Amino acid sequence: MSTYPPETLDPDYDDGTMPSNVDTLAEAVVGQRIVTVEKDVRIHDRYYGTRNATVITLDNGKRVSLVNTDDCCAYTELEAFLLHPERVDHIITGVGTTDGFTRWHIYADMGDVLELTVGWSSGNPFYYGYGFNITVEEVSA
């Protein structure tokens, strides 16, 4: 089973936003299977009308959307993802990170199911917002 020890960053560099983002994603995906992953999907946004997101569709009929953020010099951006189709039949058991929250791992008993490459900066700590906007919604029929 893959596990990743929790990362800890200097409090001058991150105010807990990144670990909170990982926890939010884990709450949405653990115990489920990934059906699809799509990048640059237009989704409804309560503030901006629509925005692009990376959308993970799960076997429980829910869609988890990760929306990039940018606020002046602070940002969080999904740069790339790698889905391991040979492992999508396995139930997700956790979400971990490596390399200072720049590599995110959604994993199951047989290893990573989905790997995310994430660029991020807290900018001028902590005046500007950063971290993914993560939403979970039911897939409409």
What are these regions (language model features)?
Residues 2-141:
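Surface-exposed, interaction-prone regions used to assemble/regulate multi-protein complexes
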